[in-house]
Amino acid sequence: MSEERYLTFALGKGRLAKKTLDLFEQIGITCDEMKDKDTRKLIFVNEEYKLRFFLAKSPDVPTYVEYGAADIGVVGKDTILEENRNVYEVLDLGFGKCRMCVCGPASAGELLKHHERIRVASKYPNIAREYFYNKKHQTVEIIKLNGS
């Protein structure tokens, strides 16, 4: 007896998951149990369309896709770039925009001008390292922080 195959979606927890579900609803695909704000479940199923959804921390979603635990993942471009997994970006859904910026004391500007080593704290160390190395030709010390 063969097991029925489900199309599995890994969704980053939070706003992107909600926006993704809203998008699915626009085309007639629902998963009512995901709307229950009190649920502690992380895996949800739509039996009608043979779809499985699971909620994960956003940085883990590309890993689930790369290793086949999910067929499709929905995360922000920042996560795709930072995690640098062997995945293919099929479509930009056009929501969940973010902006990254570099800020610091005015004295850091002088260090950058003279290509002196600076210290950079970021939630996205790979993106920061790539930016400073390839765009600014600057060697930096990266400190990983997890944001607020």
Question: Where are the regions that the model predicts?
Answer:
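Domain-level signature for soluble enzymes in the chorismate/prephenate branch of the shikimate pathway
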Residues: 1-148
